[in-house]
Amino acid sequence: MPDPLQMRAPSKRWLALAGIIVVSTSALAWSTVRLRRTGKIEGAPASENQKAVSKKQKAEFSSSSDRVSKAELVDSDNDGIPDVIELRTYQDRDAFKRWFTAIAETQFYQLSDQWNAEQRDCAGLVRFATREALRKHDRIWFQKMGPNYETVAGDVGEFDLDHNPLGEKIFRTDFGSFAETDLRNGRFSEFADGRTLKNFNTVFVTRNRREAVAGDLLIYYQPWVQKFSYHVMVFLGPARISPNGANDWVVYHTGSSPIDKGTVKKVELSVLDHHPDPRWRPVESNKNFLGFYRLKILQ
């Protein structure tokens, strides 16, 4: 006959197990009722109220983004260029100038296929180098540009040519301070000739080369040339490739004609000082040399 203690032990274990089952079942039932009342069962479709809240949050976010964009489309210095394009930190200005001069200089060694052949002239070199300097320089960018390019600086942080309110129409084409209507009435364009660059997109700096910095533009005015009276060069200063260590390099496109596509030249100012035609000498006594100008986005 079994010991009485052995018979009571199983009875206690079954009672304890039954108690656990009852408690668990009650808790599960209570949770199910509560979740049905709140409608917040994980994985279930959102209720109409939840959808409405989500739409409201998205609308508020969109409205906030619009306010930021509108706030950026102001011209606090009344120079005609919206603040969103202007590079306000030293780091961004330095990065832009390094990319700008490097891209312009590289065209002397090998023209990039990304530079439209129909826009290869002196102002076209400035436009091309400006746009490409303002892009993000990732692996795809290097592949598109071709050989001979390397990282010369970080990217411009405050402005991205591919994601901004103006798109690639970053060159102003008329006098006046900026207004939002300028974006719709043609006062900004992807194109800018030498005259447009001088009058609306740059500021005069100096006629003294000692005060010029890399990235400045040399501008000449040749009134006897009917179609394009203004000629532009890019001041490199100490070029990336400088066999003699000179620090007064410039690069420019000679311009095209019906019989000549023109070419990109890289030369020292000290050499241009002795140009056979004195009207092309970058000296203060030459009235055709207007001086050094700086892009407004760097001001």
Which stretches of residues belong to each language-model region?
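N-terminal Sec-pathway targeting helices
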Residues: 6-21
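Hydrophobic alpha-helical membrane-insertion segments, chiefly the h-region
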Residues: 22-32
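N-terminal capping segments
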Residues: 43, 61, 66-188
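Low-complexity, Gly/Ser/Thr/Pro-rich intrinsically disordered linker/tail segments
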Residues: 245-299
